[in-house]
């Protein structure tokens, strides 16, 4: 594709010469910007660096920072609460009043959790109600998407609300039939797979774009280009009205256990009444570990916004991430940090390798986040370890098209412990992507392979320092 140099295997002697670093960096993608720093974890001595103050996008490496911010601000045992409330009473199977589904900001709430809530509600012998079924997303800001420059159909760029469901996604499945295709949209869980009325999908005879989205009042509609579909398949699509989506899914689940609810209505002020049932999420520590493993953007944004809201209300991701930067500045020596989100999905969020390393060196960061990071197993082709058991590498990766980031810790029981950050990007290539190229641009795979190989060479080198 001609976008990167071929990946060669250099033969060099490991030493700490500037010349060797320059030779090694020749294996990075052509024309890319690079910043890296490696230092002694305990003393802070900088061992090697390249453009240490250059600010580049950290991509999902940002999630390690957000996790630290949330755990320190809210505490590892913090959990989110989703509640069913009422302003009436149940008599002879009839709720005389309203039923309200109240979100508590839980980014991991799913169809199975709502299924469990509906089963618990049925234990009240409720059959119907005289009032309304309402949904309330609490005081969290409602945000249409994390990064407005991303294509509308990417499920990893969802809306954000105080009432989220299935990471604010719905599953589209298509099946080839003799007369064409059958399409379905489901709020898929392990216990239930309800369809809802508020989100629809239709086939289109256009050639491009593959997906097109429209929102009219409370209804969301997707159209899919017929020519883009294969035999049978499926993918997640984002939901742009998550509170209503959660309400519609709960309405269907309640129907399955014999409770007749009216169509949900979204309300915008805190309802009065008593709690019938409360659903508690997993602990923040467990949620953060899962976020770092699976790199879920919605979780990162909700953890960051919730932590910022602990100080004062926030109205946007930018305002929330700015609070996080100010909080970090009080504890770490930062230079070249400009953040607009908590997940790193937006490439306008940038940080220098030097600042990233300073954050990773923070003693509380090492207590809170280091044990939650994934092991980075550098092995030869046949599975042999490059290094012995005396060396352990953990870290967080970050990937956008033409952005590759890696930061973490190298612990050596026979030597010194290190902390490192490596950011590689080509923002010119990224900025030149047309909208239809943004999901899978030509040349991005070879670019990414080259960037990751360069990162691996640096890690291999530092393990021998």
Predicted regions and their residues:
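A conserved catalytic-loop motif detector
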Residues: 134-200, 348-389
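Mid-domain, small-residue-enriched loop/turn segments at the edges of structured enzyme/sensor domains
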Residues: 33-35, 92-164, 168, 308-355
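Small-residue-rich helix-loop
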Residues: 47-49, 301-465
